[in-house]
Amino acid sequence: MCVFFATFAENFNYSMALTRTYYRVAEHLFAVDSSYSELLQCMTNYEPFAVEELLGERRKAKGERREDEEIFTLRVEKAIGERLKAKGEGWTHVLTDNAEEDMPRIEVYKARRREGDEAKGEKGWLFRVAMVANAPLCCEMEWSEDFTPGVLHIMADCQDVRFCIDNALMLLYAFRTAPLMTLEMHAAVVVKADRCAVRCQTAALLDRPNGLIDQQELGYLFLGHSGTGKSTHARMWLEAFDDAWLLNDDNPILRVMEDGEVRVYGSPWSGKTPCYNNAYARVGGLVKLSQAPHNKIRTISLPEAYAYMLSSASGLKMDRQMADSMYETIKHVITHVKCYHLDCLPNTEAAEVAQRGMV
């Protein structure tokens, strides 16, 4: 983990030249620009998703549009003072999210539109982030209205650069991909041998040759609020079944493909468990977990499934267009994937009950 006990300004050497790196997550391409050569040391969790050969190809293309155009670019800079120089100066405060004291505080501002102003550059969003509720700001994120280009301003006295990078990319990715039938989920995902083939894009991570898994496998998403036991239940599957493996422990990506297939992908974001698998599986089931003195699984109704999925999906739900996009994606998922509720204990019997109930 890249946590600095000196400041950002003391640890990072500035260069006039921008370095661009490309990453592909759930088959969506994005880019990160920075003038700080040490930045990549903080981004080891992104290495399995790096697309190293792309930069040279882009240079040869000389500006020609490619089918795999990046969906957004994030530029990382050191902040020179706060972007919000005075409260309300050009920005309208629309939300502060700090539900728990030990969780990050996120302040959301929307740029005010001047009368007759239709220029994209004059509209957008400003997110101000602190590591915990009462801490000073560690970074500010300034994005266009459609979340295509973005700038991450890291405060000079920031002690945890990776925290800033991860949060900026997680938020930008979630917001930008919402219209693309993609959802960034708060869930743990286990893949188990079943009826569907899985392609692993980074074979070394799973120690399997040629990037292929010669089994029929499905991915199962375990949903629930923080503290429910998603990671614990996923671990029970690994203990109960020899052919099960962990795809992601906290922030998988759910995507509806052009042919309607629903897939779950690994991501560079995985909470406390370092699980950065660049792989995917067809979704076999979504399971809402509840702690209970017994193990029991049941199929749930579409309204229940919608509510559980919406609460587990990352997105700026106050934005009408984004909310509509999320609705369409969730509607497709819950009508094409079986959804369940599992009352469970933290034991392997819970995994066995869940697995039998989803057959």
What are these regions (language model features)?
Residues 15-56, 67-193, 217-223, 236-245, ...:
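A noncatalytic interaction/capping subdomain that flanks phosphate/NTP-handling catalytic cores
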Residues 233:
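Hydrophobic positions on the alpha1 helix immediately C-terminal to the Walker A/P-loop
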